Amino acid sequence: MKKIALYTMMLGLGSLALTSCGDAMDEITSIVLDRDFAPIGLEAKSATENSITLEWTKSHDDVTYTVEIFADDSLSFAGSATNTFTGVEATKLKIIGLVYDTKYSARVMTIDNADASRNSKWSNVFFRTSAQQIFETPTENDIADRSVIMTWPAGEAATSVRVYADESLVKEQALTADEVAAGKVTVTGLDPETTYAIRLYNGEKQRGSKTITTIADLNGATLVREGDDIRALIEAAEDGAVLALYGGTHVIADAEEEGKSGAAKVSKSIVIKGIYPTNVPIVKGRFEILDGASLEINQVIIDGIDNSTTDQAFNFKTADVTYPLMSVQNSEVRNFGKGVYYLNVASTVQKLEFLNTKIHGIECDGGDMFDCRKGRIDELNFINCAMYNSCAARDFIRMDDASDLGGAPVITVDQCTIDGCSNNAGKRLLYVRYVGNIIKWSNNLVTNTAAKWSNQSKTGVPEFSNNAYFNCANLNVLDGADAGKTNLFIDESGKAVGNPNFKDAANGNFAIGNEDVSKLGVGCTLWNVK
């Protein structure tokens, strides 16, 4: 009986299992939705003043697309579409005839050609057309220190100009009917030596944009044009005068030799500066500085090529006075016979500086390149300068011992490129003998010189930091002999590097082509890409 019951139960379970297998679902081979997919990957590309290209991904075959465009809209799709396109078969559509500098919303729907009830929902995107550019480029004469003249085709509609500095709105100036008719406006209220974006608007739509940099401050300045008697203007200037030079060549005429350049006597503290950074003025001649006057030069080329003498570019002539400042920045000093400056009287210069300046073609026949004999310079700075093709057989920086005048001169040479200067084994880069001197030498690139540092016991050991040297064999030789053949010190932290591969040293382009040298952060940065 037990066996019969067990067989009966097993048979029943087997029947149940067979019944379950027979109820399996059919294989799913397709999905039928109630509507088509909306276009995916919708993008607005290649915006111009009056066109846009829309692109999307096709969902499946046997569909077309409807495209609607709404102007001055940000995906609200309010009101009526400004453009409608139906029956579009491609998935790329270029739309033209749009309005410049305008916000648009676009939407695309998939149209099922077999069953309109299955049309998709909308896919949306927004974009802005490009602003126009009807501004004409201002000429050099259009740009002043506190204003700029902007022009565009006469009669083209516009309502205002807006002025931006660092993308911040500085001012908005409404246009008059006469200005619109003429296509010309003078934008006022600007600051000197400042970069602005000037934008032309018609309502809220931008029709033009130009970036300008105002020129040096001309407030109260004496304007000097090519052909003016610059020597007379300098010598008649009062304390605090600013001479603003237009581009061109300005000759300090020699008093005795016709056709030659001479010296202008600077007896009052003055500033000489170029007006246009794009057209740096050339001053042919030299300067004799008298009676404790300060002289500041900015954005000027000082050229001694036609001088009647080989004297230095700057010569301090009056003894027993204090000169507060001589400053040369953003400039170029070239083609002088004896040297760059000369202090051979018992006077003090509180600060003498060269900043962002190129100095070259200084022969040094009869003088050293930077030459102080009987005077005292409290602070001597060379910052981000390039000195090259100069001083073939003389010392580079010379400062004799005039320590009876007191003080402790501080010499700073930082971020400079010095190429081929004092290229003679008997000459020194630092012929400094003024007792108590302090020398700071940092971030410099020195190349192609046979010079030594100093063999003088009075030369302070410089504070060296992050300097690089190429082809400077004698700067590494330490013999420790006072007045010996080579050096009392060397730059122990300096790096001997490979050829910097200057872009065009022969023509004064010292952009560094050797990446290993460039990444050290040494040398003059005037050629760095901005």
What kind of feature is each model-predicted range?
Residues 22-61, 100, 115-156, 192, ...:
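Pro/Thr/Ser/Gly-rich low-complexity, intrinsically disordered linker/stalk tracts
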Residues 294-304, 323-335, 349-364, 376-392, ...:
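Right-handed parallel beta-helix
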Residues 239-242, 253-285, 290-300, 496, ...:
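Beta-solenoid repeat scaffold
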Residues 95-117, 187-208:
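Beta-strand-rich modules
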Residues 66-101, 113-114, 162-191:
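Recognizes extended acidic, P/S/T-rich segments that occur
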Residues 254-255, 282-287, 305-314, 335-345, ...:
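Short glycine/acidic-rich loop motifs that flank beta-strands on beta-rich extracellular proteins
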Residues 456-530:
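Acidic, glycine- and Ser/Thr-rich low-complexity intrinsically disordered tracts
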Residues 216-254, 515-523:
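Acidic Gly/Asp/Thr-rich repetitive segments characteristic of extracellular carbohydrate-active
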